[in-house]
């Protein structure tokens, strides 16, 4: 097993809290069939970067609430994604039979909330009409049409929720920019962009929001780069681009 950091935020106690996915390999070789099995929470001193505490998250499930984290006004919002991307189903438009994402869940992003900075308490979940304690009632909140994989990251810019999604992860080429007045929508796609791969054997994946370097009219995202066979290490450096804030 290994642990994969997700989203995080400064808590009410002044510590940086980072959600972490516990990953399990069920096959006999690396990335043959990987499954997230639990969510953990790690508290870090933001000045010394020392780990203060680590424990099972208040929602410790494999739903991975904490995939993306954003605070706004009275609440901190925890977005969820199943993150099943190795050894599941073949990509529909590819001739390869290699198992990749789990198409039963990878388009869905749900959201929960806690009081602002209280990442140590059990969240409540958006069921399409109201917030509820029933995690099983949570509904997808990010647009899914034409998107097999939604590894969405969310931020608040100018009192609006901004969602950045590298559609279809390492199989896709488009990055969708959506904005909404609330953490659950309704979302409007205001932009689509493409960051070119660095070589014929390369791809791009996972667009993340960089919390610095933006102007009054733009914000910054970093796009990860990959080489299909993993040989060309210099291609791994992220591409950083500025994108417009919706008018």
Q: Which residues make up each language-model segment?
A:
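Beta-rich carbohydrate-recognition and catalytic domains
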Residues: 1, 10-60, 77-149, 155-199, ...
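Beta-propeller and closely related beta-sheet repeat lectin domains
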Residues: 1-9, 65-69, 150-153, 205-211
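Glycine-centered flexibility motif
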Residues: 61-66, 74
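Short hydrophobic/aromatic beta-strand or adjacent loop that forms the aromatic wall/cage
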Residues: 204-206, 237-238
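Extracellular glycan/ECM-engagement signal in secreted proteins
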Residues: 207, 217-218
